[in-house]
Amino acid sequence: MHAYPQLELWFVVGSQHLYGPKTLRAVAENAQRIVDGLNAEGGLPAKLVLKPTVTESEGILALCREANNAPQCAGLVTWMHTFSPARMWIAGLTALQKPFMQLHTQANIEVPWATMDMDFMNLTQTAHGGREYGFIAARLRKPHEVVVGHWQDPRVQAQLGAWMRVAAAVHDSRSLKVARFGDNMREVAVTEGDKVEAQIRFGYAVNGHSLGDLAAAIEAVTPAQTQDKLAQYEADYELTAAVRAGGAKRGQLLDAARIEIGLQGFLDRGGFKAFTTNFENLHGIPQLPGLAVQRLMQQGYGFGAEGDWKTSALLRAIKVMGNGNGGGASFMEDYTYDFTAGQELVIGAHMLEVCPSIAAEAKPLLDVQPLSIGKKDDPARLIFSAKPGRAIHSTLLDMGNRFRLISHEVDVITPPHDLPQLPVARAVYHPLPDLARGTAAWIHAGGAHHTVFSQGVSIHQLQTFAEMFEIEFVHIGEHTDIGRLKQELRWGDATWR
C-alpha cells in the first residue's frame, strides 16, 4: 500500500533522435522495465508513471506544462538513458513548477566486457548524458536531487523513496489551508511572520476564524456523538479514576470530547489541514483544547500553539513527509534544563499539546488536571513520555528577507526519574553535539521556542524540503562548531541580502 495513493511521480527519460528508432525503442523498453521493477519491488511511497521518451525541446516543454497542471503529479523523476543535449531542456525546466530529481542510473549493472561495442556505448550513456543534464540544471539554478547508482540497489531505492516523500510534502504545502483561532500570544516575536510572503513561497493560506463559529460547532455536537467519542477514549487510553464514568472530572472529559468533534468538523468542512489556538483567546470554549489537539495531530493535522501558524504548517509538512514511516511528529517546546554535569538534559513539553504519535506507551494515560493559564475549566490531556532514540527539532523562521529552516538533532532518552507531579506529555533529550553547543547554536540562528519534534524523517529530507522551496537551511548536529555556524549564518545574510 502506497503512503500517498492519490499522488504519482512521473518518470521522464531523455534521449534524442540522433541514435535512430532502434535505439529509442530500446530506451523505452528499458524505461518500462525499470518503472515496473521499482513499482513492484522498490518499496516506493507513491506510484511511478512512465511518460513517453522526450527527444526535443517542444516535447519537454509540453510535458513540464502538463506536470504543472496535473493535480496528481507531485514531481518528475528524470533519467538520461542516452545523451540528451541539454539546451532542449531549458524551456521545460524553466517552466517547471514542481520538484524534480535526476536518477543517475543504468538499465544494466555490469559492463558486458566481452561483447561491448559502440551500439552498446551509444545506448548506455547515462555517465555523460546525466552530466550534460546536470549542467543545465545548475546553470538555471534549479534545485534538484541527484541519486546515483543502479536502480535495483536498495540504497538507491531508499533514496528515491525518501525524495518522493519530500515531494509529497511540498505538493501538500502548495494548497495548505491553516485556520487560526485567536491571534498570536501578545507581545511574542518569533510566532509572527509575513503571511503574504508565506503564501507566495510555500502556498500556505493562513486566515483567522471566529471563536464564535468554533463555539457554535462545538455546541452543535450531539450527545450520541459525544458518547461514541468517549467509547474511543476508553478503548485507546488508560483512564484515571477521575475521568471514568461517575468520576469527579467526567464532565470535563465530556467537554473535551465535544471540543474534538466540533473542532474537527470545522476543520474538515473548511478544508483545513492545520490550525492554531491561543490560550488568551478562548471565549465561548469551556477549556483549552488539549486532548482534541493531541488526537488531531495524531491524525495528521498540523498544529501551533499561541497562534504559531509557521510551526503548524511545518508540522503538517513533516507529518506528510513521514506518513507510514514508523516515526511520529509533534508540536514541542524546549521547557527546562537539567544541568547535572556530564548528564545535561532538556525537558521538552507544552501546556498540553504533544502528539501521542511519539509516545513510548502503547496506551497513554488520559486525565483531567488544573491549568492555571487560560482561566478556563480544567482541561483533559494525554500523559506520556516520548520514545527513546534519535529525533530532530525543526523550526521555520521569518528572518525579514527570507525564511530560515533550522533542524537540530537530539537523542531522546527514557526519563531518568519518575515525574509524578508533571501531568503533561514530555520528551527528555540530549541535544547534539551537547547541550551547551547545541543550544548556543540554536540561539545564534534565532531558533524559536516552539519546534516540530520528529522521529520519522531525516536531516537530508528536511534539507531537501528547504531546497525545493529555495529557503535557507541550518543544520545543528554532532559536528556543529559555533564559529563555523556563525560564519555560515553570515554567508546566508549575504546570499539573501
UniProtKB/Swiss-Prot annotation:
One of its GO terms (biological process) is L-arabinose catabolic process to xylulose 5-phosphate. Pathway: Carbohydrate degradation; L-arabinose degradation via L-ribulose; D-xylulose 5-phosphate from L-arabinose (bacterial route): step 1/3. It is an enzyme of class 5 (isomerase). Keywords: Arabinose catabolism, Carbohydrate metabolism, Isomerase, Manganese, Metal-binding. It catalyses: beta-L-arabinopyranose = L-ribulose. Its cofactor is Mn(2+). Mn(2+) binds at residues 306, 333, 350, 450. SUPFAM superfamilies: FucI/AraA C-terminal domain-like, FucI/AraA N-terminal and middle domains. Binds 1 Mn(2+) ion per subunit. It comes from the Bacteria. Its EC number is 5.3.1.4. Pfam families: AraA_central (PF24856), AraA_N (PF02610), Arabinose_Iso_C (PF11762). Disulfide bonds: none annotated. One of its GO terms (molecular function) is L-arabinose isomerase activity. GO terms for cellular component: cytosol. PANTHER family: L-ARABINOSE ISOMERASE. Belongs to the arabinose isomerase family. Catalyzes the conversion of L-arabinose to L-ribulose. This is L-arabinose isomerase.
